[in-house]
A protein has these predicted regions:
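Walker B catalytic acidic pair
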Residues: 83
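Active-site-proximal or metal-binding-adjacent scaffold patches in catalytic folds
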Residues: 1-78, 87-124
Length: 124
């Protein structure tokens, strides 16, 4: 599998600036492929998914995002950050205390401040 270059650039920047490198480097960040069949039927319901990359020998992890639901930049980046938190916890904590700890830490590091990632935009 191949990462979307723009999504991967955002992933790397956010990982460096706000996660301080806590998210894995060996990750494929891509849009869902409508031809993937049943495993991606969620694309019209869910914004994204972080998982272990089982079909890809080049990457250990993957973030797959729904293109139809992530059209706006702010939604797209919010989804990416959400899925990155799952990777930072190594998928050990769905939306529990570890996830919340990361969300709070990212807030303290300024990710939710106006202009933190793009001029004129605020996440969440």
């Amino acid at each position: 599998m191949k990462s979307d270059p723009t999504l991967l650039r955002w992933y790397r920047r956010i990982n460096k600036e706000f996660f301080k490198g806590a998210c894995p480097d060996s990750v494929c960040v891509r849009w869902a492929d409508p031809d993937e069949g049943e495993s991606r039927r969620w694309e019209k319901k869910y914004f994204g998914e972080a998982s272990v990359s089982e079909e890809d020998e080049r990457h250990d992890w993957q973030i797959v995002m729904s293109k139809p639901l992530n059209k706006m930049w702010m939604v797209r980046i919010s989804t990416l950050v959400h899925e990155m938190i799952h990777l930072a916890t190594r998928l050990k904590d769905d939306h529990g205390p570890k996830f919340e700890t990361w969300r709070v830490l990212l807030g303290k590091r300024g990710i939710f401040k106006k202009h933190a990632l793009r001029r004129g935009y605020t996440l969440f």
